Amino acid sequence: MGGWLGRQRRLLRMGAGRFGAPMERQGRAAATSAAVGESADSEARRRDPLRRRASSAAPSGSGEAESVRRERPGSLGGSTSAGRPRAEGLRKRRPLFPWFGLDIGGTLVKLVYFEPKDITAEEEKEEVESLKSIRKYLTSNVAYGSTGIRDVHLELKDLTLCGRKGNLHFIRFPTHDMPAFIQMGRDKNFSSLHTVFCATGGGSYKFEQDFLTIGDLQLRKLDELDCLIKGILYIDSVGFNGRSQCYYFENPADSEKCQKLPFDLKNPYPLLLVNIGSGVSILAVYSKDNYKRVTGTSLGGGTFFGLCCLLTGCSTFEEALEMASRGDSTKVDKLVRDIYGGDYERFGLPGWAVASSFGNMMSKEKREAASKEDLARATLITITNNIGSIARMCALNENINQVVFVGNFLRVNTIAMRLLAYALDYWSKGQLKALFSEHEGYFGAVGALLELLKIP
């Protein structure tokens, strides 16, 4: 998304594509998308025979694609006759490069990209220029314009997917920049690569028509909870470049003694999965294929950021967190000790517990004494207390003692993670441990990639 973001928006305003198609029509666009995409792809293949050899193999389910696969000589798995059947089977199952998974959320778009590192000299020679351009653009940049970021510290190296070895890259950008991303796909000629994007999240419905009309790209829409479960189980199974993917906080309430420690999720079931994005969904997971959505709440990361924008005038999520880190919520919240003068011993409520979030703001004097940082901190504690309370009740009702918190709300948000960890430990009397994951916000996109590759 380089410096082209502003330029692409101008192109869109000048008529370079139909961004902004009526939303009520987008739910019906899937059938039209498939028909139009198939016709356009057939014509493009006629014009460009090199597409038949765009460094991997055509997706299954098409008679024409099967004939294309049979035309390709050689085996990617080696020259021995014993290895040929397996290699041929892998080639027939895997789609063409590039391999992407998309999770289009209400606030952020998460994209995972598999970069093949085992490309042979023959493949590189036959590789079309648009594919080389895409790979170079995504892997040689860390930032894409002012909003796109590749999380280099999360890169997974030396993975094997569908018989190909490579690295997995993790990229994010704000959802409001999706039109510019689609335009970039058009500029880089994505559609000539016979690319079908596997996408999850609400935006896969919202932007489906734009992908088709602007980028000439098809979206295969996937259930976001299916992708979430599949993604977290896969990432946990491959680990984090030799390190543990899962972790917890020891002594979360003590800033000096607090430690981040690895946790081995070798027996993941049953598992309570708390996905904190713009809103919150809570899932009870009993096996890879057996799970249910227990409940959720509309008070999530979007609520925190939105309220901080209103109360403090901040403009970014990172700015809101920075302000919260310097604030004192006790100047904003009414505590148990403010009501009882100390602990409420009969029900075991300590004096420092919050009795009423923002309760002190009823007083004019206390409103004037509270800083923007105090308001941001109180907002963060309000949201995390609510999520922690609901998660605890769900864990008790479902008789589950492993609670994993994921989602982009937790990105660079150690304060919230420690608050959740302490709340869960305190109110459960040590019976519940809050667990977290290094790739917290990318599991949906990983699940979408696995679906593209048909990995169970």
From Swiss-Prot:
Protein name per the record: Pantothenate kinase 2, mitochondrial
Gene Ontology molecular function: any one: pantothenate kinase activity
Catalytic activity: (R)-pantothenate + ATP = (R)-4'-phosphopantothenate + ADP + H(+)
Residues that bear Phosphoserine: S55, S56, S75
Functional description taken from the UniProt entry: Catalyzes the phosphorylation of pantothenate to generate 4'-phosphopantothenate in the first and rate-determining step of coenzyme A (CoA) synthesis.
Known partners and oligomeric status: Homodimer.
Recorded family membership: Belongs to the type II pantothenate kinase family.
Gene3D superfamilies reported in the protein's UniProt record: 3.30.420.40, 3.30.420.510
Metabolic or biological pathway: Cofactor biosynthesis; coenzyme A biosynthesis; CoA from (R)-pantothenate: step 1/5
Region span, Disordered: 16-89
Compositional bias ranges of the Low complexity kind: 28-39, 55-65
GO biological process: aerobic respiration; angiogenesis; coenzyme A biosynthetic process; mitochondrion organization; regulation of bile acid metabolic process; regulation of fatty acid metabolic process; regulation of mitochondrial membrane potential; regulation of triglyceride metabolic process
Catalytic-site annotation from UniProt: E224
Gene that encodes it: Pank2
Cell compartments where the protein resides: Cytoplasm, Cytosol
Ranges spanned by the short sequence motif Nuclear export signal, renumbered to the chain: 154-161
Activity modulation comment: Inhibited by acetyl-CoA. Inhibited by calcium hopantenate. Activated by palmitoylcarnitine.
Amino-acid positions noted as binding acetyl-CoA in the UniProt annotation, renumbered to this chain: S278, S281, R293
Source lineage: Eukaryota, Metazoa, Chordata, Craniata, Vertebrata
A GO CC term assigned to this protein in UniProt: cytosol
Enzyme Commission code: 2.7.1.33
